[in-house]
Amino acid sequence: MERNKIYKEDAIKFLTSVAEKSVDLAIIDPPYNMSKAEWDTFKSQNEFLKFTYHWIDALIPVLKDTGSLYIFNTPFNSAYILQYLVEKGLVFQNWVTWDKRDGFNASKNRYTHGQETILFFTRSKKYTFNADAIRIPYQSASRIESAQKKGILKNGKRWFPNPNGRLVGEVWHIASERHKNKIGGKTQKFEHLTPKPMEMIDRMVLASSNKADLVLDCFAGSGTTAVSAKKLGRNFLCADNNPQYVALANARLMEL
């Protein structure tokens, strides 16, 4: 299969065409069963889970033994997906909470929805993770400025902050595209319903792959994974069954 191309293809059919154990990193933003679009609507939760498990079964064989996998979804659906991945022998690494900063679907009957889950799994205990490549600024600038001069005492040892910032934790405070692009307080419409922030996809690509590695996305949408991979010197294999999204993704790639 030709690399660095976005295929107009159904996810499962696409995955069956990918060579076994060829993928270093898979970043998957699949349907959530939220009924907000035709591609995200299922007759029942059982039908949704059957579909989800089907593409997972097709995905696992294409991951290298050292490969990594990120899957977006709701916390509720992620609980099922996590259990299924564990049963399939993948190694759980993190349950990442993405704080979207947008307070979507505010309710007075329960806590406001403002997050999504990102499951981070690996094919085995041997995998790529470039922690230093994704460091972020320390939260307390004044405290860090003081620590850089004389250090901070932790467990009886003198600690000095890393000049490149702190390590990334399991809660990611990254504004959603709908939140970042509000005009006059109003959410703008996107060509794709749920685009993911480039900053977030870049973090995954930098952390869990190296230059020239192969990154896969079988629900490519507007092509953010492909754009990130190309920009950061990785190869990619992506697919989406919507021709409009494929055209949009290719247009974004042409701009690089």
Positions of predicted regions on the chain:
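C-terminal helical cap(s) of enzyme catalytic domains, especially alpha/beta-barrels
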Residues: 246, 250-256
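Core catalytic lobe of class I
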Residues: 1-248
